[in-house]
């Protein structure tokens, strides 16, 4: 079943948050000696929305619920990495959120006189639990996105001879589009009003890291080295390849299961 998205409603606040996530990842990424610090300066989602198809509807993965209980004091948006302890891990969770009510033994007396002491009266049955108006559910979506988004980055090309950082040339990079093909899990936890997001990969999530390039088979980048009012060198392959690797690594470390994002929704 296809799903239509109102892509135009993606606002600047989400773009600002994603810029912060990318800059955090870029700050921790190991850079080649010839590239200076990299910073994302702007992000535009573009006009091309992804093709989304609903492929499955199921119970929420147990990993989402357990992490939510352990990290209930965290901020409204968090990034969660899979725990190192893999004991009891269940890839396709079949977790029953319905809390069982313990059986209550009720002893009734044949003598129903009104003068029976209060402490000898039969205990009252507990009231039935209130039905949750927001049930838990998890959607699996197949996403095919030929994007025309635009991400602008700045960095510098370092010349380390005859001494370190002997010369620095400014670089402007623009990601002008990408292709994403994969499966996205969106889990809605109604009781706590939280949404968990992650990308599902065919590889074993706890196995050795594989080639995730198939999730982002194409990333289009334009590069300029030098100042705009002087000589400019365009489309430098080595710099563009480094940025492509960083983007793919960011997607893997931030969103590929068992890593996921949790968004805490405001109470209505």
Curated annotation (Swiss-Prot):
It comes from the Eukaryota. It holds the Pfam family MMM1. One of its GO terms (molecular function) is lipid binding. It is found in: Mitochondrion outer membrane; Endoplasmic reticulum membrane. InterPro entries: Mdm12, MMM1_dom, SMP_LBD. Belongs to the MDM12 family. Keywords: Endoplasmic reticulum, Lipid transport, Lipid-binding, Membrane, Mitochondrion, Mitochondrion outer membrane, Transport. GO terms for cellular component: endoplasmic reticulum membrane; ERMES complex. Residues 66-136 are annotated as: Disordered. Residues 102-111 have a biased composition (Polar residues). The keyword Membrane applies. It comes from Laccaria bicolor (strain S238N-H82 / ATCC MYA-4686). This is Mitochondrial distribution and morphology protein 12. Its main location: mitochondrion. The SMP-LTD domain is a barrel-like domain that can bind various types of glycerophospholipids in its interior and mediate their transfer between two adjacent bilayers. Residues 112-121 have a biased composition (Basic and acidic residues). GO terms for biological process: mitochondrial genome maintenance; mitochondrion-endoplasmic reticulum membrane tethering; phospholipid transport; protein insertion into mitochondrial outer membrane. Residues 1-266 form the SMP-LTD domain. Component of the ERMES/MDM complex, which serves as a molecular tether to connect the endoplasmic reticulum (ER) and mitochondria. Components of this complex are involved in the control of mitochondrial shape and protein biogenesis, and function in nonvesicular lipid trafficking between the ER and mitochondria. MDM12 is required for the interaction of the ER-resident membrane protein MMM1 and the outer mitochondrial membrane-resident beta-barrel protein MDM10. It is a peripheral membrane protein. The lineage of its organism: Eukaryota, Fungi, Dikarya, Basidiomycota, Agaricomycotina.
